[in-house]
Curated annotation (Swiss-Prot):
Record-given protein name: Probable dual-specificity RNA methyltransferase RlmN
Organism phylogeny: Bacteria, Bacillati, Bacillota, Bacilli, Lactobacillales
Binding-site positions, S-adenosyl-L-methionine: 163-164, 195, 218-220, 296
Family: Belongs to the radical SAM superfamily. RlmN family.
Binding site for [4Fe-4S] cluster: 111, 115, 118
Named cofactor requirement(s): [4Fe-4S] cluster
Originating species: Streptococcus pneumoniae serotype 4 (strain ATCC BAA-334 / TIGR4)
Transmembrane segments: none
Recorded name of the encoding gene: rlmN
Main subcellular localisation: cytoplasm
Length: 361
């Protein structure tokens, strides 16, 4: 199985070109064809020699993904189901925001974090995506607009799809390098956000990288007992260890951290929990931001339901009165398989049902 050309960061592409006996500037030409002109085949790279095109075709593919399903919401959200070369399925979501087009990418096939409210973890991690498979999600979403003649360009990226990004650390970092490259897609680092469920040691590593990418932490509970009951990762990285890493990140980078907090009815949405959260954030209040997330129900996790609006507002008001910066996240795609992992999970169910029906007509 040939790798995608998108797996090469700019420097690696320069090295590959030199290994082929070509001049270094050829790498810049290939890069421009891929990320500025966004071609779908090497044959479209008309300023390259036939010999170099043949070498590219022999060693790489341009697009490693196959589009299986596209769902468009009334609010402009678009959800994509892509098939990988090995037949595995992943999801990508485009969201229209007031500040531009934002794409949520997946970094792993399945997830081992095991959050008890999440559709992504219904299927355990099968493998990491390589850099090229993550980049290709962005390129195919952009192609969706290019083909329609819509003069719109992806401006923001959130790494919050299926999987734990910091469990696929090096591929995710190379993804950042590729899409941030000023000769390519040139998406600013401050327009990119990566979300972790709390791998404390990787948060420290990320602080030391010196990149300008934004950090979000999936917190979802203000104390260890509650967090461990809904997020098993808290047993390995309890709140004390997690917040020591977060404080190190803030001291090292002087950058704000966003805390994701999903609102689960009668689980973590009480004023008591809001007060606990303000206490937890008191030392980093100036550089923290809480994102309150309305819950998208998942049939396999029917023990949970969405917090009533009045509970969300009471929680929000409590944080605000204590000086915590917070917002209630705007919902997207509520009329399609909205929750992360739902489209993939539902498609896999239907595929299994078809297979069983074929065996037992």
């Amino acid at each position: 199985m040939k790798p995608s050309i998108h797996s090469l960061v700019h420097q690696t592409m320069q090295e590959w070109v030199l290994e082929q006996g070509e001049k270094k500037f050829r790498a810049d030409q290939i890069w421009e064809w891929l990320y500025r002109k966004r071609v779908q085949s090497f044959e479209e790279m008309t300023n390259l020699s036939k010999d170099l095109i043949a070498k590219l075709n022999d060693q790489f593919v341009v697009n490693p993904l196959k589009q299986r399903i596209v769902q468009e919401s009334a609010d402009g959200t678009v959800k994509y189901l892509f098939e990988l070369p090995d037949g595995m399925l992943i999801e990508t979501v485009l969201m229209r925001q007031h500040y531009g087009l934002s794409v949520c990418v997946t970094t792993q096939v399945g997830c081992n974090i095991g959050c008890t409210f999440c559709a992504s973890g219904l299927i355990k991690k099968q493998r990491d995506l390589n850099n090229g498979e993550i980049v290709a999600q962005i390129m195919l979403v952009q192609k969706y607009f290019d083909e329609r003649g819509q003069d719109e360009r992806i401006s923001h990226i959130v790494v919050m799809g299926i999987g734990e990004p910091f469990d696929n650390y090096n591929n995710v970092l190379n993804f950042f390098r590729t899409i941030n490259d000023d000769k390519g897609m040139a998406i600013g680092a401050r327009h990119i956000t990566v979300s972790t469920s709390g791998l404390a040691h990787k948060i420290r590593d990320f602080a030391d990288e010196g990149v300008q990418v934004n950090l979000a932490v999936s917190l979802h509970a203000p104390n260890n007992e509650l967090r461990s009951s809904i997020m098993k990762i808290n047993r390995a990285f309890p709140i004390e260890k997690l917040f020591a890493a977060i404080e190190y990140y803030i001291e090292t980078t002087n950058r704000r951290v966003t805390f994701e907090y999903i609102m689960l009815n009668e689980v973590n949405d009480g004023v008591e929990q809001a007060l606990e959260l303000t206490e937890l954030l008191k030392n980093i209040k100036k550089l923290s931001y809480v994102n309150l997330i309305p819950y998208n129900p998942v049939s396999e996790h029917d023990q949970y339901s969405r917090s009533p609006k009045e509970c969300v507002l009471a929680f929000y008001d409590t944080l605000k009165k204590k000086g915590v910066n917070c917002v209630v996240r705007q919902e997207h795609g509520t009329d399609i398989d909205a929750a992360c992992g739902q489209l993939r999970s539902n498609t896999m169910k239907r595929d299994r049902q078809k297979a069983v029906a074929a065996v037992n007509p």
